């Protein structure tokens, strides 16, 4: 079996060496070269054709975002961004994901020399996962749609979307939409949410993402959406026309008191399927309170999280949608759900917003 050829791109000689040592410790990985900036990386990609690239965000000469754009235009290659847990770092990382990077490695804070080695196993796993991902960017309708949306963005932070769902207001509080996503998901979730009209039931978004990144993810979506998108807060009342993003490193659950549903953010609940937030955990509570009026959507990602969640939706009589294989960066979570026979509709994400509203109207009458 041939080794996974990795190119490391970082302006820090120390970080290049640490990453190289970590990756070389695994027999299935070969570090073919290192580069100190995006320009050098692009030349090495043309020469060496690596299977995976680890890419720093902030670098001289050519930064990680511009390098990602160039590489994806020349030869789509799985790119893992190495990102700082700061607002600026999170924004840059999400921008790189919009431009084709498949995932990101959270750059440790504090004593880098100690912390980076602590997450060595995770880095190796992410590189292996990335090597299995599909990055045929040119053929992806959803990413072309995202690019168009970015071009259409004006200086106005929130677009004035005139269309509404047409749902009867009295039913909006009885219906809920759950969206679960992992690797390759942020641009897809963003595109779906940007095409959701006003007068829509509450949406619960579980994207596998660490603390700090989820808030920026929500803020970016909010700037391009007809509804309010926010990182979920402990104790807040669930409302229609709102999308709630589960905070990183916490589980998002629900509680009903009187006639209201409240969001509970629990940092102490364990990881399930090796991740927190977990789609399956939130699904248990969404289906508990919304039952047959739940619409479950499962998008690209590795592993099986969300498959049991869709099963819960089906068991309650709700409606389930999975992203099709052709558009998935990693066809893991949707594939598991489809194999479990708990998916009503398999489709391109570009068609999902319309499908959500169509089914919500059936519920809302």
UniProtKB/Swiss-Prot annotation:
GO CC term, one of those recorded: cytoplasm
Write down the PROSITE patterns for this protein, in alphabetical order: CHEB, RESPONSE_REGULATORY
**Residues the record marks as active site:** 182, 208, 305
* Keywords carried by this UniProt record: Chemotaxis, Cytoplasm, Hydrolase, Phosphoprotein
Which residues are annotated with the PTM 4-aspartylphosphate? 56
Any single GO BP term: chemotaxis
| Modification after translation | Phosphorylated by CheA. Phosphorylation of the N-terminal regulatory domain activates the methylesterase activity.
EC main class here is hydrolase
CheB-type methylesterase domain segment(s): 177-363
Q: Which reaction does it catalyse?
A: [protein]-L-glutamate 5-O-methyl ester + H2O = L-glutamyl-[protein] + methanol + H(+); L-glutaminyl-[protein] + H2O = L-glutamyl-[protein] + NH4(+)
Protein's cellular compartments? Cytoplasm
**Is Cytoplasm there in the keyword field?**
yes
The protein's GO terms of the molecular function aspect are: phosphorelay response regulator activity; protein-glutamate methylesterase activity; protein-glutamine glutaminase activity
SUPFAM superfamilies from the entry? CheY-like, Methylesterase CheB, C-terminal domain
Feature: compositional bias, Basic and acidic residues: 146-155
UniProt-listed Enzyme Commission number(s): 3.1.1.61, 3.5.1.44
Decide whether keyword Phosphoprotein is in the record: yes
Against InterPro entries, the record matches this protein to: CheB-like (IPR008248), CheB_C (IPR035909), CheY-like_superfamily (IPR011006), Sig_transdc_resp-reg_Me-estase (IPR000673), Sig_transdc_resp-reg_receiver (IPR001789)
Q: Where does the record place the Response regulatory domain?
A: 5-122
Q: What does this protein do?
A: Involved in chemotaxis. Part of a chemotaxis signal transduction system that modulates chemotaxis in response to various stimuli. Catalyzes the demethylation of specific methylglutamate residues introduced into the chemoreceptors (methyl-accepting chemotaxis proteins or MCP) by CheR. Also mediates the irreversible deamidation of specific glutamine residues to glutamic acid.
Family membership: Belongs to the CheB family.
Q: Cross-referenced HAMAP family, in alphabetical order?
A: CheB_chemtxs
Record-given protein name: Protein-glutamate methylesterase/protein-glutamine glutaminase
């Amino acid at each position: 079996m041939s080794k996974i050829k990795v190119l490391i791109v970082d302006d820090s000689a120390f970080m290049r060496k640490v990453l190289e040592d970590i990756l070389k410790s695994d027999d299935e990985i070969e570090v073919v070269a290192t580069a100190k900036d995006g320009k050098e990386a692009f030349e090495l990609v043309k020469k060496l054709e690596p299977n995976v690239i680890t890419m720093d965000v902030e670098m001289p000469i050519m930064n990680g975002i511009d390098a990602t754009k160039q590489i994806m235009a020349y030869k789509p290659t799985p790119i893992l961004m190495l990102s700082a847990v700061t607002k600026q770092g999170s924004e840059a990382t999400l921008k790189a994901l919009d431009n084709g990077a498949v995932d990101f490695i959270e750059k440790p804070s504090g004593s880098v020399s100690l912390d980076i080695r602590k997450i060595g196993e995770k880095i190796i796993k992410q590189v292996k996962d990335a090597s299995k991902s599909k990055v045929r960017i040119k053929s992806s309708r959803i990413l072309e749609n995202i690019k168009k949306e970015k071009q259409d963005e004006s200086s106005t932070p929130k677009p004035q979307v005139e269309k509404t769902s047409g749902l009867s207001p009295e039913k909006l509080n009885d219906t809920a939409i759950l969206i679960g996503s992992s690797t390759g998901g942020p641009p897809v979730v963003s595109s779906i949410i940007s095409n959701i009209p006003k007068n829509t039931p509450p949406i619960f978004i579980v994207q596998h993402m660490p603390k700090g990144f989820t808030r920026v993810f929500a803020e970016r979506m909010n700037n391009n959406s007809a509804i309010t998108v926010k990182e979920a807060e402990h104790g807040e009342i669930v409302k229609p026309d709102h999308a709630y993003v589960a905070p990183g490193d916490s589980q998002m659950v629900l509680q009903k008191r009187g006639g209201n549903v409240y969001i509970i953010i629990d940092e102490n609940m364990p990881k399930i399927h090796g991740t927190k937030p977990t789609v399956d955990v939130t699904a248990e509570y969404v289906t508990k309170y919304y039952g047959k009026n739940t619409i479950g959507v499962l998008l690209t990602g590795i592993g099986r999280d969300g498959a049991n969640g869709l099963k819960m939706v089906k068991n309650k009589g709700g409606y389930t949608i999975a992203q099709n294989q052709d558009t998935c960066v990693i066809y893991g979570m949707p594939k598991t759900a489809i194999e479990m026979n708990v998916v009503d509709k398999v489709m391109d994400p570009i068609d999902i917003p319309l499908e959500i509203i169509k089914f919500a109207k059936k519920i809302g009458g």
